Amino acid sequence: MHPTVHARLHGVTRIYPAGAGGKPVHALGPIDLDLHRGEFFSVVGPSGCGKSTLLDVLGGLAPPDQGSVTFEDRAVAGVVPDGIGIVFQEDASFPWLSVYDNAAFGLRRAGMAAAEIRERVDHALSFMGLAGFAQAYPAQLSGGMRQRLCIARTLVTRPRLLLLDEPFGALDQQTRLLMGDELLKLWRETGATVLLITHALDEAAMLSDRVGVMSARPGVFLDLVQTGWPRERDSNIVSDDAFGHITARLWSTLRSESLKSMGSAQGTTSR
């Protein structure tokens, strides 16, 4: 593997078995993708095209039926590898635990020393703007704050590859923009490689070094769009003329695929 390639999908196919009286669902591929070390890569595509399936396969949550997945030159198979962190759209916080205890939960289960846990959790909560809410409970937080907590809980594991499955999907537009700025700050300061699944073309265009546009099911990449943004960027970039050109290119590819997806007669939807 080339030294700048952090993770690779090669010839990956994923097929879901048939349900009662149905047919197997060819959800993904064959698909090839190289994620470069330290890049921010977003994936857009029509509903049901296999975006989340791609993330599951890359993160070790689901095995490919064909092809191979590697992370840092090691095969990904069966379990989430050390060094990969995953954040989902759903609020995964534990309502009976404080913000601090939510962030510390995984580290405690792993048997980490108390002093190291405190140092990591304090840093993550401070970084995500939650230091003043360490003893609060999730029900006392806004939607955006709860999602920052979920990111903090992943951040304490110090992931080198961060996989995000529509983490801001349930938030309003203003909060999404602010959370996007927080995510860019996190990406710059940690140096992690990031893969983001999103339905929002503007979000993908703003945050990413590259955007992959997927086809209707079975999902493959139809276009890989290089944004050309500087590493130091924030949501103000949406006023740049190039931003409109990028989103227009994404939509020109995605529109016909979305119509195909809407008109599909298949009854089973892959994520």
Where are these regions (language model features)?
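Catalytic Walker B motif of ABC-type/P-loop ATPase nucleotide-binding domains
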Residues: 162-165
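Hydrophobic anchor residue at the start of the ABC signature
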Residues: 151
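The feature captures the beta-strand-to-loop junction immediately N-terminal to the Walker
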Residues: 44-46
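Conserved signature/switch motifs of ABC ATPase nucleotide-binding domains
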Residues: 136-139, 157
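Conserved ABC transporter NBD signature motif
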Residues: 67-79
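Conserved ABC ATPase "signature" region
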Residues: 108, 115-133, 185
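Helix-to-loop junction immediately C-terminal to a conserved catalytic motif
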Residues: 59
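Short coil-to-helix segment of the ABC ATPase nucleotide-binding domain corresponding to the Q-loop/switch region
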Residues: 97-105
